[in-house]
Amino acid sequence: FENTIFQFLDFQSSKDITNNEAMAKIAGGGNLSNYYNEFKIAGSDNGVNPLHLMARSSQEGANKATYNSVAGLFTTNVSSDSSYAYNKTARGNTLNGYYNFYNIGAWYGNGYSAIGRGLAYAGGFLESDSCYDVLNGVGTYNVERCGILSYLRPWNTQAIAIAGGANFISETYVKMGQNTNYYEKFNVSPKTQYSLYSHQYMTNIHAPASEANSLWNAIVAGSLENEAFEFHIPVWSDQER
C-alpha cells in the first residue's frame, strides 16, 4: 500500500520534505547523485517536492550519464531526424551542449526523433530562425539577440536544465491542478485548468505507480515516514469503499 499511495502525494504541500539520504536512494549512485543541491533549489524555487523532480528525471532516463537527453552530445541521425528539421532550416546537424532532464517536449514529429525534438526544445531550436547562429554545422540560440526563452531556456547547463524543467512542471502542471503523479498522467483533477482527461505528461500508464514506488523507497531511506504528507485521492461515484 505505502509503495503506491505516493502517486497521490500533493507536490506543493510536501515541497520541503527531502534530504540527501532520500535523494541518494533515488539516484542509486547514478548520474543524478551529482545534482542534489540543484534539485533542492529547483524544488524550493518552484514550490514542488524535490524528490518528485528527481524521481521524474530518473524515470525519464536522466540517471544514466550517457543518455542522449543529458549527455550534452547529440548528432542528427538521418534515419530518424529529417533534413527538414535541421538542414533546410539551417540550424545545424548537432544539438551539443543542451540538456533535458525531464524529456520535456520529447515526442516524435515534425521531422524530429523524440530525443531530438526534446533537445531542440531545450536549445530553443523550435523558435524563429532569426535567433540562430550556425557555425560548422552547429546551431546556437543567440540569447543576446533574442533574450531568454520561457522556462529559462536555452538549457545549456545541467543546473539550468534542472531548474528550467522544474519551472515548466510547476507552471504547466502542478499549479494548474495536476499536482500529483496520478493527475499528471490521468487528468481527472477537479481543479484542473485543462479539459478533463487531457494534458497528460507521459504516455506510460505505469509511470505513476513506478514513480510512487521510488518516492516511498526514498522516504524510507531518508527516515521521513513521520512527516506530514497530504494526499489527493480521487474517489469515483459508486466506488466500493
Q: What residues fall within each predicted segment?
A:
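Solvent-exposed, polar/charged alpha-helical surfaces in well-ordered, non-transmembrane soluble domains
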Residues: N37-I41, M54, A163, N167
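Extended amphipathic alpha-helical segments with heptad-repeat/coiled-coil character used for oligomerization
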Residues: V70-G72, N77
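Non-catalytic cell-wall polysaccharide-engagement segments
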Residues: S80, Y84-R241
